[in-house]
C-alpha cells in the first residue's frame, strides 16, 4: 500500500491543496455575500451554483477526460478553478458569482472524477479500499481545515 500511495503522492497533494482552498473559499464567499448586502435570493443562488455545477459536471467531464486523459484534464480543471476563485473580488455581481460557482463546481467534480479514476486504475484490488479511504479522509480533512483557517487572526 505504501508503494501505491508513494506513486500517487503528487496527486494526493494536489487534490488536498485544492480541497483546502475550496473549503476556505466557499466559507469566505458566504461571508462576503452577506457583507456585500446581496438579497436572500442572491445568497441562495450563489450558494447553490456550486452544487448545480457538481450535478451537471459529470456529464461533460467524462467526454473531456476520455479525449485528453487524466493528467491534462486534472490540470485544466485545477487551472480553471483557480482562475474562477481569483475572479470573485474583481466583479461584485450576484449573477457573475453564481456563474463562477457553477464553473467551480464543475471543476471540482472534474478533479474528483480524475483523481478517483486514477486511484481506481493504479490500485490493486487488495489495497483499493484502503487507498480510497485515505483519499476521502484527506479531502474531508482539508476542506474542514480550509474552513477553520478563517478563524486565524490576520
At which residue positions do the language-model features occur?
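Helix-loop boundary and gating motifs at the non-cytosolic
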Residues: 2-51
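Short hydrophobic/alpha-helical segments at membrane-entry points of transmembrane helices
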Residues: 11, 95-101
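Loop-to-transmembrane helix entry/capping segments in MFS-fold secondary transporters
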Residues: 40-41, 125-135
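Residue-level signature of mid-helix packing/kink "hotspots" within the transmembrane helices
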Residues: 51-59, 143-144
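Helix-to-loop junctions at the C-terminal end of transmembrane segments
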Residues: 57-69, 150, 154
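Helix-breaking motifs and short loop linkers at transmembrane-helix boundaries and internal kinks
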Residues: 69, 90-92
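Structural signature of the two symmetry-related core transmembrane helices
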Residues: 72-86
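Intracellular juxtamembrane helix-capping segments at the cytosolic ends
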Residues: 110-123
Amino acid at each position: 500500500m505504501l508503494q501505491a500511495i508513494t506513486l500517487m503522492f503528487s496527486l494526493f497533494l494536489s487534490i488536498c491543496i485544492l480541497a483546502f482552498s475550496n473549503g476556505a473559499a466557499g466559507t469566505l464567499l458566504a461571508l462576503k455575500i452577506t457583507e456585500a448586502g446581496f438579497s436572500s435570493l442572491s445568497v441562495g443562488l450563489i450558494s447553490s451554483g456550486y452544487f448545480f455545477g457538481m450535478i451537471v459536471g459529470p456529464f461533460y467531464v467524462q467526454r473531456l477526460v476520455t479525449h485528453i486523459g487524466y493528467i491534462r484534464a486534472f490540470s485544466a480543471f485545477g487551472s480553471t478553478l483557480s482562475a474562477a476563485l481569483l475572479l470573485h473580488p474583481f466583479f461584485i455581481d450576484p449573477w457573475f458569482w453564481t456563474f463562477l460557482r457553477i464553473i467551480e463546481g464543475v471543476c471540482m467534480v472534474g478533479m474528483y472524477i480524475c483523481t478517483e479514476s486514477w486511484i481506481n486504475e493504479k490500485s490493486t484490488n487488495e489495497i483499493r479500499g484502503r487507498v480510497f479511504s485515505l483519499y476521502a479522509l484527506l479531502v474531508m480533512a482539508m476542506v474542514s481545515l480550509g474552513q477553520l483557517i478563517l478563524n486565524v487572526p490576520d
